[in-house]
Amino acid sequence: MYNVKKDFPIFKNQGDPYVYLDSAATTHKPQCVIDSIVDYYSSSYATVNRALYTASHDITFAHWQVRSKVGSWIGAQYDQEIIFTRGTTSSLNLLAIAANDSWLAGGTVVISEAEHHANLVSWELACQRSGATIKKVRVDDEGMVDCSHLEQLLKQGVQLVSLAHVSNVSGAVLPLPEIAHLVHRYEALFAVDGAQGVGKGPLNLSEWGVDFYAFSGHKLYAPTGIGVLYGKKELLESLPPVEGGGDMVIVYDFEELSYQEPPLRFEAGTPHIAGVLGLGAAIDYLQALPFSITDRLTELTHFLYEQLLTVPGIQIIGPKQGAARGSLCSISIPGVQASDLGFLLDGRGISVRSGHQCSQPAMVRWDLGHVLRASLGIYNEQQDILLFVEALKDILRAYRS
């Protein structure tokens, strides 16, 4: 079996054991991504889109090539559908502000009752400014959107539906093609928070009918501070810019102001060039791996779920075994604080997430205070899961004695 960990220097440089089970928060970086950033700053540094000298020309070409790589990974039709942002949160806010300045005013946005704050608060702020209304669609006990309830809301008149591809709490994976078809039947638009979906394998957004898709590079083994907003070309062309600055205008002379076509219309100022190049290197790395990322993560997630079933007295949030689940499991243990468990596990070299996962409405939906979440990346192995579960059992035995 291919040894993925050898490609990630963090696993050589941390102590032993180092069991990292927090890839839903952020993924580690392979050496090739780190090298791409160092090479840019040390050997090929220049700005993009602004100069004719050779170094700038070369890096501008490399920078644009990453749009093609991203488009290939997510299934876009055109390079122009790829807007570089700071991350998922930045992408969703960009979309919400642009929509607020165009077709959202006085309308209705639908989100689920279990969204991440990035998807909740961005639309809440936009609706406060525009006078639009937010309505929430129910999710079932496993975290799946209630499509019957969604259709009821759509019948009342909705401009946009914004949902997470994969829940960062329950791990529920939404059937994007089916939901897109339903949303479009009622002439609404469909936006997706793809933070937890983009790293599970290549996507096919144009075929699925998704109108907008937001994600972060740092959850795709790329650097922090770089993200993407995908939007259908004709929809992006209909939206106004949300920031002004260099490279997003064609003409400005105090009397005339004209904007670039997307994506440059939405990329004012000097971009995060190193981050973009790192994102491209991450996609190159993932596409060259000698195995299916989707299959590997699915198998590991099933193994994690099965092992957690052997822990007495815990509740596993989200889909049952065999159903579609992102590469994470959140658990709740009555009478035991998740933060205590996270602290004690850290003392044994095991990194997991404890808290409300930046999704307080999800905690309300499942009547939880906090959860402990273990999430997987391509570098994880069954041994990581066994060490985590055995440590969890040992801590709980001591906790209950």
Swiss-Prot record:
Gene Ontology molecular function, alphabetical: cysteine desulfurase activity; pyridoxal phosphate binding
Pfam families for this protein: Aminotran_5
This enzyme's EC code(s): 2.8.1.7
Reported cofactor(s): pyridoxal 5'-phosphate
Active site per the UniProt annotation: 358 (cysteine persulfide intermediate)
Keywords linked to the UniProt accession: Pyridoxal phosphate, Transferase
SUPFAM superfamilies noted in UniProt: PLP-dependent transferases
Modified residues (N6-(pyridoxal phosphate)lysine): 219
Keyword Transferase carried by entry: yes
Transferase listed as a keyword: yes
Highest taxon in the source lineage: Bacteria
GO biological process: cysteine metabolic process
Catalysed reaction, written as an equation: (sulfur carrier)-H + L-cysteine = (sulfur carrier)-SH + L-alanine
Protein function: Catalyzes the removal of elemental sulfur and selenium atoms from L-cysteine, L-cystine, L-selenocysteine, and L-selenocystine to produce L-alanine.
Family statement drawn from the similarity comment of this UniProt entry: Belongs to the class-V pyridoxal-phosphate-dependent aminotransferase family. Csd subfamily.
Name of this chain's protein: Probable cysteine desulfurase
The species this protein was found in: Chlamydia trachomatis serovar D (strain ATCC VR-885 / DSM 19411 / UW-3/Cx)
